């Protein structure tokens, strides 16, 4: 599909047995529109629905999807976005302040996968509890929850690589220390960034954009789930 608008936010929402990610995406869209009423938002989902006051575009995955591992469909975002410049966001997030300045920073690259995360005190997270495979394999500390790309050969190469890793996971898994049984998007993005070149698709020196991560060991909660 060819882009029909210059820039916008793409929210990926595939419902699972345990989580209604489409509902999460609606809340995220509301927070984006609160700060930026004119922001353009596209919902990418496997559940048919019409555009509305929250979603200017609704797209279904353009290729057959992997039902066993919903993460493995992520490479399709490159082909599904209606925007020439896209910021992809995970559905289970909130935007708590203006983010329009992100575009200026991110345009320094054709692709930018966010690096590192912060705790609820807005400090760089120090816990590496969830990042053993990254540290053991010297992978870039990327978080796909915020990913930017513009229509370009570099972005196409990146997402072709992402697809290749997902579809050939046993071969990649065999090369890793402490590998995951099923590939997570963060690990796949980290491997893809290593292949394409971290200097090409990450900006670890930048203070933003980063997510505030609310996992137990990052926020030093005593139990999991900490909201109970």
Predicted feature locations:
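Conserved catalytic core of nucleotide-sugar-dependent glycosyltransferases
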Residues: 104-166
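Catalytic core and acceptor-binding pocket of nucleotide-sugar-dependent glycosyltransferases
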Residues: 139-228
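N-terminal anchoring/stem segment of glycosyltransferases
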Residues: 1-66, 151, 196, 225
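Catalytic phosphate/metal-binding cores of nucleic-acid and nucleotide-processing enzymes, i.e., regions
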Residues: 16-18, 23, 43, 80, ...
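GT-A fold catalytic core of metal-dependent nucleotide-sugar glycosyltransferases
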Residues: 60, 70-124
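Short, polar loop motifs at secondary-structure junctions
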Residues: 44-51, 97-99, 206-207
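Aromatic-acidic/polar surface patches that form glycan- and anion
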Residues: 14-25, 67, 136-140, 178-185
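N-terminal cationic-hydrophobic initiation segments that often serve targeting/anchoring roles
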Residues: 33-34, 78-79, 103, 193-194
